[in-house]
């Protein structure tokens, strides 16, 4: 059976909501206005995030990357990668945030990621210009569109917030925490609660019958 794991980045791989912190830090007034509207689903992520990003001067891009450099990765992520590699199951990172931020935080783990899909930024003008290969619907990175690229028998999603909702609704096996868990409860969509990636690894090991029932 061919399997694949799709994993969000901000607030999922990272302990904190890295991208939201960047928006609030580099565009505080617009973020204070638009982020609550996005969480309340009164404004789409596609429109709100674009407006905030394109208000940030291009000259500040190095500061954005430096701001995220020391973000903490959630415990167990490396162990999950070890487990998935042993099972020959690829992990794909799908982030609604900036590609550069993801690459800075993951660092030496990047070669172990099967693929990374995120928002690209053009800094050749005065302000950020957003480019996204998978922009569509309500999202700058339409995660369901990304998932459709991968033809496998079993898809697993891991996430934590609003940017993961559409992905979670379209995936049979979902690990959800924080805001995503709340949204899924509203939609009456079953999910597996989790706090760290060791829990994800151990659940998948049991699901795939890789450990005995009495362990």
Which functions belong to the PLM regions below?
Residues 1-54:
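Active-site neighborhood of HAD-like aspartate-dependent phosphohydrolases
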Residues 1-5, 9, 53-64, 158-175:
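Long, low-complexity, intrinsically disordered polar/charged segments
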Residues 21, 66-68, 133-134:
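Short, contiguous strand/loop micro-motifs
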Residues 25, 70-71, 93, 171:
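Residue-level marker of alpha-helix boundaries and capping positions
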Residues 30-36, 61-64, 112-113:
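Short, surface-exposed acidic
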Residues 46-82, 87:
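Metal-dependent phosphoesterase signature
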Residues 76-90, 97-215:
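C-terminal cap/substrate-recognition subdomain and adjoining C-terminal extension
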């Amino acid at each position: 059976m061919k399997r694949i794991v799709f994993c969000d980045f901000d607030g999922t791989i990272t302990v904190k909501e890295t991208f939201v912190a960047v928006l609030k830090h580099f565009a505080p007034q617009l973020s204070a206005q638009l982020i609550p509207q996005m969480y309340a689903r009164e404004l789409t992520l596609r429109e709100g995030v674009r407006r905030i990003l394109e208000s940030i001067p291009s000259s500040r891009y190095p500061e954005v990357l430096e701001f995220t450099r020391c973000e903490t990765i959630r415990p167990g992520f490396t162990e999950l990668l070890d487990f998935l590699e042993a099972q020959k199951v690829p992990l794909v990172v799908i982030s609604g945030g900036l590609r550069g931020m993801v690459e800075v935080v993951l660092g030496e783990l990047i070669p172990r990621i099967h693929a990374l899909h995120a928002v690209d930024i053009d800094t050749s003008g005065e302000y950020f210009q957003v480019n996204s290969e998978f922009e569509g619907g309500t999202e700058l990175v339409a995660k369901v569109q990304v998932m459709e690229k991968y033809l496998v028998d079993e898809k697993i999603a891991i996430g934590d917030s609003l940017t993961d909702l559409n992905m979670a609704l379209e995936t049979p096996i979902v690990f959800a925490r924080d805001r995503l868990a709340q949204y899924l409860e509203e939609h009456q969509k079953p999910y597996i609660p989790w706090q760290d990636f060791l829990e994800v690894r151990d659940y998948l090991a049991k699901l795939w019958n890789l450990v005995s029932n009495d362990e």
